[in-house]
Regions:
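Hydrophobic, aromatic-enriched interface-forming segments
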Residues: 121-213
Length: 255
């Protein structure tokens, strides 16, 4: 497949899948800018999209140059478009990008274990051990997820956006062991580890299972610790859905 001569902006989610999509498109020298957005903002038309944009793992918006996705729901919502590269059988948007541009032959510098890790992460196919004591790529996945909540506890040297931008380049030619030892990743790992056991106890003590539903009530907690969003399911393996209740801003409402 011929490589486009011009450069595009990548519009994607601020998560591990978005990070790897950025790596792949940067490896093909297709992008010179990255914008991280929320999917609902795309659906609500709040993000201006045109022919200079490539989107990944987001709802399709008309006018985009290329849109990569793997959600089956998008095949129902949107009529088939030539620039909508969607594969519901793929476990991640990064895998769709990877396959579209030629797979391993097109990306000799991208380690296969990285693609397996992003597939596992986006499809939530973690083992209990990987959830409760993550290592390697799984650990990077969780610390880069805003839902883990690390940003509530420390003003890091650089923002998550800056770290994502640095990792798009750094991850292309460094091992996961080297990535986890970089200062800006390491300080997030240290905070994650410092909260790990407290978060498990909190999830266990504040949760009540009703059938297959897990109710997590955090309104009596002075501190809500940081931790990955799958821990509660590892602690309560019979639950298949959870409802989390906590105070809103200045306890004016519950959310």
């Amino acid at each position: 497949m011929e490589q486009d001569a011009m450069k595009y902006r990548l519009v994607t989610r601020s998560d591990f899948d978005g990070l790897v999509c950025g790596m792949l498109l940067k490896e093909k020298d297709l992008i010179d800018e990255v914008t991280f957005v929320h999917p609902k903002d795309m659906q609500d038309g709040l993000i201006a999209i045109d022919g200079h944009d490539i989107t990944t793992n987001l709802p399709y918006v008309e006018g985009v140059h290329l849109a990569f996705d793997h959600h089956y729901s998008e095949t129902l919502r949107v009529e088939q478009q030539d620039n909508h590269i969607i594969d519901p059988e793929a476990r991640s948007a990064a895998r769709v990008v990877y396959n579209y541009y030629g797979g391993p032959e097109a990306f000799p510098n991208i380690a296969p274990d990285l693609l397996e890790a992003v597939d596992k992460g986006d499809a939530a196919e973690f083992t209990v051990d990987e959830v409760l004591d993550p290592q390697g790529w799984e650990l990077l996945n969780f610390i880069m997820d805003a839902r883990t909540g690390l940003g509530r506890f420390r003003n890091f040297r650089i923002s998550n956006y800056q770290l994502m931008m640095e990792l798009i380049d750094f991850c292309r030619n460094h091992s996961i062991e080297e990535i986890l030892e970089t200062p800006d990743v390491k300080e997030r790992v240290e905070l994650y580890r410092a909260h790990q056991e407290d978060f498990k106890r909190q999830m266990y003590n504040c949760s009540r299972q009703i059938g297959r539903v897990l109710l997590v009530d955090l309104r009596e907690e002075d501190t809500i610790y940081a931790g990955n969003r799958f821990v509660k399911y590892a602690l309560f393996p019979e639950a298949c859905i959870s409802i989390q209740v906590m105070w809103g801003f200045k306890k004016q409402n519950t959310v």
